């Protein structure tokens, strides 16, 4: 009993309350048996106590989940569950009784605070089965009946307390075939269900990086890509659950349809298989209907700008490379007022669109809000809006709480004001959103008349339904209300008749109404008082009059709560019929919140409306880095960018800390912002078609995959060379620095040539290899590769080094590496030694090395003399051929390839 006493004292509960409330005798804990630790009775059979039988029966259905086993005021965990929970939650691991001569490990959390513990477990990727007492302990003869009523997993949570209000919580399923992978994901808290198909593991990794699912379902098979192995939240399921035919049947049955053509997935078997597996898992864990999932949508990859996982990480969209979420693009951009608006903005940020018409409408809407000064009015109205999207989900799942109703009521009451703000605005998108808001006056009136102004947290507290809504409920409440005056009058009468001035009339939930007299006055108690309870310092009594009153009042209160629950269920039914329109309304309000936030940011930060051009170009005038500008105290130095068909690559040189990486990132972020519908931090931005943003910036060892810094660098570079197109924007920062000087220089040169000649993408190529600046001269000689030099400079002022942060045409003439080292605090002796060594190197071979590394044309690789007797590409291809293995057709194709290499 030591553990129970300690915990009960901490939570202010009786040490035996849980056992008494559950009618679980102490001996039910003793001699109980874990199946792994069997104890046999005299007949040789394994024997369990009633409590342990009940626990094992529930646990056997959910062997891989933590089981929260309700025992009165606590949820208990036993055996391995207890050990795991104690470690993850930092709660006490204790024991009670024994099993097979060994103690029974136990850990528990109080019911009134369990949501906090549950949230921590879910965040760690754990799933929990909630086993509740479904019988009334007061009526139970023996053990209280229990049943698993709910399963909480990282991807299926809908409770407000378990969710991040500004981030989607997604459940994803992945199937695979010879053609690639099928993905399905659902936001149960928001009512969204989507699918997609990708053709490679790289594309799959990019989608997972974009969506960041909390839970991932995959077939229990081998050879999954490495990035999935060991990932938190991955759950292996039987492979037969990922069958395309059964998935199709499951979707048809769920949506009550005859075909899936309306969803656009009839010819997507891999995505259909994933969707069926996901839907089956949701139905299995939620144990109820899911009326808020009304459709399934196919995401089309070509409609969005592609960004792989490395690009998202390098650009620090919502999380910095070090894991911090502050000082990110989202942190600067997010001016939304509502949680649902914040979630929509995050989705837009991670899926910038290529749909020019959609983006132009968004830009125009933002400009209209600014011109009409309507953004401030909208944002002020939205401050009282609440998270309608998730509230509607809880309404659909019939788990809405009283204050969800009042928040929904107050939100719907704002619609006339929002419509009035939008009505005069001349913007196609704003008028479309105005129409999507719909008319919900009847629903608003219902909630205004039915829900109390400030309802309690729980329905069981009573007082949720407004006075005047239901006559029967009002009558029952009058009985309870008049009870207070009756008790005051009774107390005064009894004090007068008994002569006991300290006599009190009170009530508690265990013993009901009572008359309390102190121990010192107890001998004066009238004869018609019947003792009800003895306390340390007082005696409590009951009289016939008080008993009669108690029966009447308690009956009225019970009937009042019962009536209120019935009316509450009626409200859920009524709202259920309006869900579709209300969901569209919530979606429109979310988008309006984002657009109004864009307008606020544009004005506060002096951003301008971008121009989306159909011609290939990327022209940015006086562009700034949105995050760096926001966090630094000094004015930000704006810079231009001009790329087009004849100028596709900039080789960027300059000192460390000069701003090369900032310059590259700011241009990528400006492009991204333009493609979500936002204004951009530039005086002007003209942006042609962009299909991908690919980056190779910075590096670090990937210890989990056993990859060095250089290996990570080469893997990311390889991805870019294989995927960049003439419409891609590529950022390359310091390629080759992770290996020896000559190897690094050779690789950097080869990568730059490949990007310029083969990929022909827009490229910002920052480097410390000054030899690469000769590529621009070779570009002019070759005529077609469009390479130019720009640099960022610094000036020495006495012993100080001042970085100018201005981008200028031409190559840098100094690196200032030693000056930067001195700024970093290297000992003066080390810097002096470095200066001497640099002078020796420059005198000994710097000039000849530079001459050797200066090719005159991009099509003359034989001039690049770093390696002994370099073979030509044609020679290498010819040596790789095996004539005996070639068919006539393959031989002819090989001949054409060889000719092209000459």
Swiss-Prot record:
Keyword rRNA-binding appears in the UniProt entry: no
PROSITE patterns in the record: DNA_MISMATCH_REPAIR_2
Any one of the GO CC terms: cytosol
Annotated SMART domains: MUTSac, MUTSd
Amino acids binding ATP: 654-661
Gene Ontology molecular function: ATP binding; ATP-dependent DNA damage sensor activity; damaged DNA binding; mismatched DNA binding
InterPro entries: DNA_mismatch_repair_MutS, DNA_mismatch_repair_MutS-lik_N, DNA_mismatch_repair_MutS/MSH, DNA_mismatch_repair_MutS_C, DNA_mismatch_repair_MutS_clamp, DNA_mismatch_repair_MutS_core, DNA_mismatch_repair_MutS_N, DNA_mismatch_repair_MutS_sf
Keywords from the UniProt entry: ATP-binding, DNA damage, DNA repair, DNA-binding, Nucleotide-binding
Keyword Flavoprotein found: no
GO biological process: mismatch repair
A matching Pfam family: MutS_V
Family: Belongs to the DNA mismatch repair MutS family.
Described purpose of this protein according to its UniProt entry: This protein is involved in the repair of mismatches in DNA. It is possible that it carries out the mismatch recognition step. This protein has a weak ATPase activity.
Protein name, as recorded: DNA mismatch repair protein MutS
Gene: mutS
């Amino acid at each position: 009993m030591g553990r129970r006493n300690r915990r009960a004292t901490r939570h202010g509960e009786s040490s035996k309350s849980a056992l008494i409330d559950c009618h679980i005798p102490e001996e039910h804990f003793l001699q109980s048996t874990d199946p792994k630790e069997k104890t046999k009775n005299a007949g040789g059979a394994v024997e369990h106590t009633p409590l342990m039988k009940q626990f094992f029966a529930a646990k056997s259905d959910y062997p891989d989940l933590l089981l929260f086993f309700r025992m009165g005021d606590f949820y208990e965990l036993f055996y391995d569950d207890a050990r795991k929970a104690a470690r993850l939650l930092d709660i006490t691991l204790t024991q009670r009784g024994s099993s097979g001569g060994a103690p029974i490990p136990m850990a528990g959390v109080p019911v009134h605070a369990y949501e906090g513990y549950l949230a921590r477990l879910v965040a760690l990727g754990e799933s929990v089965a909630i086993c509740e007492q479904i019988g009334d302990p007061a009526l139970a003869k023996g053990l209280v009946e229990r049943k698993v009523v709910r399963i909480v997993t990282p991807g299926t949570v809908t409770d407000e307390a378990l969710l991040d209000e500004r981030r989607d919580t997604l459940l994803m399923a992945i199937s695979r075939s010879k053609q690639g992978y099928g993905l399905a994901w659902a936001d149960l808290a928001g009512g969204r269900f989507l699918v997609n198909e990708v053709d490679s593991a790289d594309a799959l990794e990019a989608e997972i990086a974009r969506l960041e699912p909390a839970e991932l379902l995959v077939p229990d098979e081998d050879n999954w890509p490495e990035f999935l192995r060991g990932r938190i939240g991955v759950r292996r399921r039987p492979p037969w659950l990922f069958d395309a035919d059964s998935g199709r049947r499951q979707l048809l049955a769920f949506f009550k349809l005859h075909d899936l053509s309306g969803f656009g997935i009839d010819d997507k078997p891999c995505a259909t298989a994933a969707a069926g597996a996901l839907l089956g898992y949701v139905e299995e864990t939620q144990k109820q209907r899911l009326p808020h999932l009304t459709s399934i949508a196919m995401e089309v990859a070509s409609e969005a700008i592609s960004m792989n996982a490395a690009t998202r990480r390098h650009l620090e969209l919502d999380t910095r490379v070090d894991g911090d979420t502050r000082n990110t693009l989202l942190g600067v951009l997010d001016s939304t007022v509502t949680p649902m608006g914040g979630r929509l903005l995050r989705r837009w940020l991670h899926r910038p669109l290529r749909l020019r018409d959609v983006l132009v409408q968004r830009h125009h809407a933002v400009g209209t809000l600014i011109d009409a000064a309507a953004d401030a009015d909208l944002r002020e109205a939205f401050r009282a809006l609440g998270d309608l999207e998730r509230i509607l989900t809880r309404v659909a799942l019939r788990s809405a709480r009283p204050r969800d109703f009042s928040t929904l009521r107050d939100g719907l009451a704002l619609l006339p004001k929002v419509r009035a703000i939008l009505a005069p605005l001349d913007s196609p998108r704003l008028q479309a959103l105005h129409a999507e808001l719909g008319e919900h006056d009847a629903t608003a009136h219902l909630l205004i008349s039915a829900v109390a102004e400030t309802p309690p947290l729980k329905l069981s507290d009573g007082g949720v339904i407004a006075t005047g809504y239901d006559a029967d409920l009002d009558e029952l409440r009058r009985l309870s209300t008049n009870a207070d005056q009756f008790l005051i009058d009774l107390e005064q009468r009894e004090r007068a008749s008994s002569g006991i001035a300290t006599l009190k009339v009170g009530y508690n939930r265990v013993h009901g109404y009572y008359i309390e007299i102190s121990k010192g006055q107890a001998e004066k108690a009238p004869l018609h008082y019947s003792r009800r309870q003895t306390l340390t310092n007082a005696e409590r009594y009951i009289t016939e009059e008080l008993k009669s009153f108690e029966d009447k009042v308690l009956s009225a209160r019970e009937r009042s709560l019962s009536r209120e629950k019935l009316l509450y269920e009626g409200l859920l039914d009524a709202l259920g019929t309006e869900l579709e329109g209300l969901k569209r309304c919530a979606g429109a309000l979310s988008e309006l919140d984002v657009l109004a936030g864009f307008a606020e940011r544009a004005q506060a930060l002096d951003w301008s409306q971008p121009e989306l051009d159909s011609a290939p170009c990327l022209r940015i005038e006086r562009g700034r880095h949105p995050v760096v500008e926001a966090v630094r105290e000094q004015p930000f130095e704006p810079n231009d960018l001009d790329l087009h068909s004849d100028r596709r690559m900039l080789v960027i040189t300059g000192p460390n800390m000069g701003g090369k990486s900032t310059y590259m990132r700011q241009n990528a972020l400006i492009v991204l912002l333009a493609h979500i519908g936002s204004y951009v931090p530039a005086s002007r931005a003209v942006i042609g078609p962009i299909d991908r943003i690919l980056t190779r910036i910075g590096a670090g060892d990937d210890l989990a995959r056993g990859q060095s810094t250089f290996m990570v660098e080469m893997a990311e570079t390889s991805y870019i060379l294989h995927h960049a197109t003439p419409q891609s924007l590529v950022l390359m920062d310091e390629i080759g620095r992770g290996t020896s000087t000559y190897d690094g220089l050779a690789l950097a040169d080869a990568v730059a040539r490949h990007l310029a000649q083969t990929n022909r993408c827009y490229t910002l190529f920052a480097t410390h290899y000054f030899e690469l600046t000769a590529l621009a001269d070779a570009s002019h000689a070759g005529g077609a590769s469009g390479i130019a030099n720009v640099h960022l400079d610094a000036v020495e002022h006495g012993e100080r080094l001042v970085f100018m942060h201005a981008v200028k045409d031409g190559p840098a003439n100094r690196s200032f590496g030693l000056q930067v080292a001195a700024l970093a605090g290297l000992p003066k002796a080390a810097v002096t030694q470095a200066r001497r060594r640099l002078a020796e190197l420059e005198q000994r071979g710097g000039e000849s090395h530079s001459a050797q590394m200066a090719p005159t044309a991009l099509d003359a690789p034989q001039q690049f003399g770093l390696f002994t007797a370099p073979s030509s590409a044609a020679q290498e291809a010819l040596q790789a051929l095996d004539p005996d293995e070639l068919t006539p057709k393959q031989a002819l194709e090989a001949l054409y390839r060889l000719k092209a290499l000459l």
